[in-house]
Regions:
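Terminal leader/tail segments of proteins
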Residues: 1-70
Length: 70
């Protein structure tokens, strides 16, 4: 398992200032951790959002989806 910060590539902000992280598991699953809560998951190339969240967390989810869904 590796944990790294979600970079802001598609979002207009320069950074998410350490509030959004990606957990990359060895089996290929990835999870988005926003404010210490798992809010999205990628399995087999598809992103699943695990609920509705604040505007900022929604930005994290959109960025995560644009970067990792194929």
């Amino acid at each position: 398992m590796k944990i790294f910060e979600l970079p802001a590539i598609y979002d207009s902000r320069k950074s998410f200032y350490g509030k959004a992280h990606i957990i990359d598991y060895e089996n290929g699953t990835m999870e988005l951790l926003s404010y210490n809560t798992i809010v999205s998951r990628v399995v087999n190339g598809k992103v699943k959002h695990l609920g509705k969240w604040s505007a900022t967390t929604s930005r994290h989810q959109k960025e995560f989806q644009k970067q990792f869904e194929y």
